[in-house]
Each structure stands twice: as structure tokens, then as C-alpha cells.
Amino acid sequence: MDYRMCWLEYRGLPADVAGKLKDWFSSVSILEPGSSVLKDEIRRFSERSIGITPRFYSRPLKKEKYIMVGRLESLPIKLDVNLGEEGFMLRTIEWNGSKILLVTGETKKALVYGIFDLMKRIRLGEDIEKMNVLAKPKAKFRMLNHWDNLDGTIERGYAGNSIFFKDNRIIINQRTKDYARLLASIGINGVVINNVNVKKREVYLIDSIYLKKLKKLADIFREYGIKIYLSINFASPVYLGGLDTADPLDERVARWWREKARGIYDYIPDFGGFLVKADSEFNPGPHMFGRTHAEGANMLARALAPFGGVVIWRAFVYNCLQDWRDYKTDRAKAAYDNFKPLDGQFDDNVIIQIKYGPMDFQVREPVNPLFGGMEKTNQILELQITQEYTGQQIHLCFLGTLWKEILEFDTFAKGEGSYVKRIVDGTLFDRENNGFAGVSNVGDSVNWTGHDLAQANLYAFGRLAWNPDEEIERIVEEWIKLTFGDDEKVLENVSYMLMKSHRTYEKYTTPFGLGWMVNPGHHYGPNPEGYEYSKWGTYHRANWEAIGVDRTSRGTGYTLQYHSPWKEIYDDINTCPEDLLLFFHRVRYDHRLKSGKTLLQTMYDLHFEGVEEVEEFIKKWEELKDRVSPDIFERVKERLHMQLEHAKEWRDVINTYFYRRTGIPDEKGRKIYP
């Protein structure tokens, strides 16, 4: 095997712990037909962590201690619990003269989740004799979006090539199954396997030439409770069907999609549905035919509805041909302006997928006002696990801290307590089909994610999607212990690095919600005016005196899309959170912040501080040289040194840019290039 298994590397447990577990794992009763996945995982854990090979039975046992795995309905013990479709229970009980650790749920996938959770808890030191866990996911949809292309490349991928595709073929191998294991262990239940930008070759993924292989892929993922989805091109009836239109209100088009859906479900009965990027960045959509997003999405949804499928429709729609001289058009307003008027017009099996912020996964953005703005529409929160604008898995940038802030944001849509996490789990507006989507950071590299520590982003996404109330510090501790073991120094140093890393990255790149000071196209490295005169609506409009776009009620009016009190808070430069100051306001460089320092001096200071913090990360990592495996140590060390050099470049380019703009030097006399 030429890759590691991230947090599922089952290492040997301490001898005293393994000794206590041997009695439990020597005999396992699995009351579930077709339970090879359950047996395989238990066997793998037992052999590697405990040092024994368990014997499996399909009946209750007469034994002092053992594990029993089965659906609630198949247990010889009657339990009055409501677990739902995906919830599970781990409970140690005494029954019929035996001590039994029960792993139970109402479905097979619940048992899979339960087994992975049991292994995790044992590895984290919990006592099997006192196990009492009842866990249910908060959100129905917990998905990964792969931006993988059939040729094997990955759009915005920084961890090698696709694990799904190569040379226009679908790949199925041992790594496919291991990926399903990784995802099931963190509660992911859906995977979109191809890029939302569906090119001419990818259009054929819904055709019979690929469906036979897709069926095999779906069969593997199904065993782990995961449905597969496909991104589609809205104009497929033209490209594939030979029609002269893709108008969603044309009956020929609707019929074509109904027949195509039937063909897919003939191969994959539990196919999840379609992800659609329409009328966005030159992708075709219903606007081409004078139709609304609701009309386009509903037509597709009705083709899938008889089979239980859903349409996930991205809200990433804006004018991508803006003239930089146009001061009235504001890209930040686009998603709300396009979709808010359609609230309540989408079918029940349509879900609008909304990026966390109104722009495009910048280092920091405000929460998208569509969260709280659409009460009658299913919504999925889209987060970007892959680090397109946050260091591309060369820089250490743990995103879990940012995601937690987003989830805890109170929209005030129904008064105080209207948190984003309550919107995406469906409870605030009583919506069933809500959830999470994360743009995957996975490729075929040895560590799956390019940077070994970027695995923490994938792990944190899954854990937060399962339970957005989980403390991020706990998630970080779990990942470190599962990945590196129980070394306290490793836990201390890596936790420090992860928890600080996003703020550090923000400091030496674009603080204050500035954004977009990157090189066009590939989005790596500093370029203060790389997008300043482009068609993409990505402007900061810096001159010698001030910087930032006025998005207040006196400017573009973006602040008016929020509920009170946020519209008033963001509208006032004195109450606007400073970490978003330049997103909402045009600010003079001599404006005094709460610290008493000017905006410009703070900008200088932050960029120097950010570099110093990366130097600190390197020292922290060097202290772990003999405490983590040599290959991981060297890979992370190499990336941290690359990060340091690139952070210095960011510091010098951005500070020089502002110095040359303003002529105002750094008060502390540090090196800035005139």
C-alpha cells in the first residue's frame, strides 16, 4: 500500500489496555446479514491494535464478555430508544449472565458508524466497561464535492491526481474502499465524484458508457453508508440528446431528463442525485432560455423525485463580466439578489448550496446573508476544505476554527439564537433536506491531502457536519491523538500550530476581510492588483488615501441584506468588527482602530507578526523530530520552510505596496522596499 490511512492507522495499544480488551474482542456476535464490512473493520482493529484475531458468530453467546453488533430489531434485548436512520448506540450491559458491549442502530449504515466510533473511543482511552453513547447526526446531508475531471486532474486540487479518474476512465481499486472507510469514520454520507464545471467529456458520465463502472463504485460506497452523486451540465440534452434546446419548460427536455434519470437508477438504485452549477462562470443554465433558477431546478428535481433523488443547485451566481469602472454592481450582493426572490418556489427535493460567504472562499468573509434570508428553501452550507485561497496545502492553515465561527454566527432571522448551525441542520426553519458540503482536499498523494496536517481539515469537516455543536478544540485533540498517538508534547505543539494557523495566514496575507490580492488564475502568492482591473468583481480600489469597497447603506447597500442588528453593526465603521472592516467600508489609512494604531500601521504590524508566527511553527515542529514518524516529520518540515519563504514574500509585497501607495513609513523602521 503506497499511502497512509490518516486517522485510521490502527497502532498497537499499550499492553495493559490491549490485555483488558482481549476478552471483549476474542468473540464478536454480529446479528446482521451481509456484514463483511463490519467484520473486516473489527478484525483489522483487533489484529493491529490488540494483537488477536476475533471469532465471529451470528447468534448471542454464552460468554463472560463479548461484543454484540446488530440492528435494534434483531437484538434479543428490547431497548426503547429512537435512533433514526443514522443514529447509533454503544452501551455496555449485563444480560443473560454476560457482560455485553452493544453496538446497535436501526440501519446497517448506523452500525458502520457505530463500529468506527467504538474504535475511535477505545483509541482515545475510553473505558469499554462503561460505554454509554447515543449519537445521531444533526444534519441529513453531509457531503464532499470532488472537483475531479475525467482526465485525472483536479480543479483546485493540491494533493496529486484524482482517486476516481484517469485518462477518461473510472478507477476502482483498494484505495477506493479505503477512501470510503475514511469518510464513513467521520460520518460523511454523500460524495459528488466529479467537477461542478462539467466539461464536454464529463457530460457523458450520466450516459451508459460510464454507468456500468459507476455502479461498481456505488456498490463499494453503499457498504459504508455513502451515496454517490454526479455534477451535470444543464445543457446535456443538447450535448448528449441531440435536442436543439435545454429550456426547462420544453416538454422534450423534461422527458429527456426523466428517461436519463430512469437509466441511472436502473444501474444505481440509491443514486443520490445531481449537483448543478448553472448560469455561473459561463456554465449554461435556465437564464439562457428566459427561465428562473427555480424553474430549472424543479424540472430536474421532478425527474429524480420518483426515485428519491435530489437536485443540489449552487447559489454561486454573479456577473462575471463586470467592468471595473462600474462602482454600483457589487458581486457580494449577487447570490442574495438572485435567490432571495425565489424563496418558497423550489420543490422539496431541491437544495440550494450556498458558499459560506458572499464572494469565493476568501481568507475571511462575512457569513452569506442568504443564511437567514431564505426561510422556505432547503439549504446546504458549502465550505472549501481544499485550500484554494488559504495556502494550497503548502501553507499550514487549519480551517476548523473559521468554520466554527461561521456555524456559531447568529443571523437573527427569527430573533436571537438563529445560528447558522441551526439553519443548516434544518431545525430553525423546520426543513428536512439541509446539510453540509465540503469541497474535497483529497488526491492520490501518499497522505491523501498533500500536507499531512491538512488531514485535520478533512477530519474537522466531517465531525462538524455530524455535530456542529462539537467544540473545535476537542476535534483537534481527537485528530492529533488518532493520527500521532498519545505523546503529550505532540498534542501540545500540533494543537497550538493548528489552532493558531488560520489567523497567522490571515495576518501575512489579507487581513481585515480584504481578499483577492492573489495571482490571477492559479490563486497562489501575492499580487495586490492581480484582480483589480478584471471582469470578476473582485476590487479593493486602493489609492494613496484609502482602501476598501463601501458596502454600507451609503454605498452598494450590501449591509441591507442582513437582519438587524447586523445591518446596523456592519453599516457603522465604529461598530463593524475590525476583522471585516475593509470588506464593508472604505477606510482611510490613517483611521484609528480600537488599538489606537492606524489602519496602515496595523497592516504593517500584522504582516511582520504573521511571518514571526510561521517561524514559531517551525520551532514547534522541530521539537517533535523523534516523536512522529520520520517520513511525516520531513514532509511537514519541508512544507513549513516553504511556507516561511512564501510568507516573507507576502509580507514584503503587501507592505511595499502600501508604502509605495501612501509614502507613509513603518513606525518601527523595519525593512520595507521603497
From Swiss-Prot:
pH dependence of this protein's activity: Optimum pH is 6.3 with more than 50% activity occurring between pH 5.2 and 7.9.
EC number: 3.2.1.131
Enzyme class: hydrolase
Swiss-Prot/TrEMBL site (Participates in a stacking interactions with the sugar rings of 4-O-MeGlcA) positions: 147, 536
Pfam families: Glyco_hydro_67C, Glyco_hydro_67M, Glyco_hydro_67N
Protein name from the UniProt record: Xylan alpha-(1->2)-glucuronosidase
Keyword hit for Hydrolase: yes
Keyword Cell division: no
Catalytic activity: Hydrolysis of (1->2)-alpha-D-(4-O-methyl)glucuronosyl links in the main chain of hardwood xylans
Family label: Belongs to the glycosyl hydrolase 67 family.
Temperature remarks: Optimum temperature is 85 degrees Celsius.
A GO term for molecular function: xylan alpha-1,2-glucuronosidase activity
Keywords linked to the UniProt accession: Carbohydrate metabolism, Glycosidase, Hydrolase, Polysaccharide degradation, Xylan degradation
Residues annotated for beta-D-glucuronate binding in this entry: 197
InterPro entries assigned to the protein according to its UniProt record, in alphabetical order: A-glucoronidase_C_sf (IPR037054), Glyco_hydro_67_aGlcAse (IPR011395), Glyco_hydro_67_aGlcAse_N (IPR005154), Glyco_hydro_67_C (IPR011099), Glyco_hydro_67_cat (IPR011100), Glycoside_hydrolase_SF (IPR017853), Hex-like_dom2 (IPR029018)
Quaternary structure and partners: Homodimer.
Free-text function comment from the UniProt entry: Alpha-glucuronidase involved in the hydrolysis of xylan, a major structural heterogeneous polysaccharide found in plant biomass representing the second most abundant polysaccharide in the biosphere, after cellulose. It catalyzes the cleavage of alpha-(1->2)-glycosidic bond of the 4-O-methyl-D-glucuronic acid side chain of xylan and releases 4-O-methylglucuronic acid from xylan.
Source organism: Thermotoga maritima (strain ATCC 43589 / DSM 3109 / JCM 10099 / NBRC 100826 / MSB8)
